[in-house]
Amino acid sequence: MENLHTFLARYPPFDGIEPDTLRALVQDAEQHSYEAGDQVLVEDGLPAPGLWVVLAGSMDLLHEGEVIQVLEPGECFGHPSMLTGMAPAYTVRAREPSACALLSEAAGRRVLSTEAGVAYVARTMRRRLVRTGQT
């Protein structure tokens, strides 16, 4: 796979970050592989330790056992839990063999504090609330 910072630079909210800054933010990111059915985050479980990004494959975002979104490469998850320190409101489960990157909490907060990051959080939260009928 290409360098993580090059991959991320194609997707919001990373696409608005200067290349050198993005490279520094992701230098300590961990890459994880998952088999179909593996859970990464558990609804009402431990808070997210950072910002997750799907690199390959796809992940199901579930609320109360129902799939409300399929996360594809370039999409983030765990940000509401990471930002609040609260338990995740959703379970995230590998739909197929998948790979994800985990950015540290500090790096995730820095990414999401940009104008593009704030817009990304608002957009994803609105979409998820609509899909769960909580608007």
Label each region the model flagged.
Residues H5, A9-E64, L71:
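Regulatory nucleotide-sensing modules
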Residues E30, G50, G85-T91, P97-A99:
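Helix-loop-beta junctions that constitute the ligand-sensing/allosteric loops
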Residues L4, D20-L22, M82, A87-A89, ...:
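A small-molecule sensor/coupling module
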Residues P97-G108:
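A short hydrophobic beta-strand segment most commonly corresponding to one strand
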Residues E66-P80:
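Short acidic-glycine-tyrosine-enriched beta hairpin
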Residues L55, G65, T84-M86, A94:
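Short loop/turn positions at the edges of beta-strands in beta-sheet-rich folds
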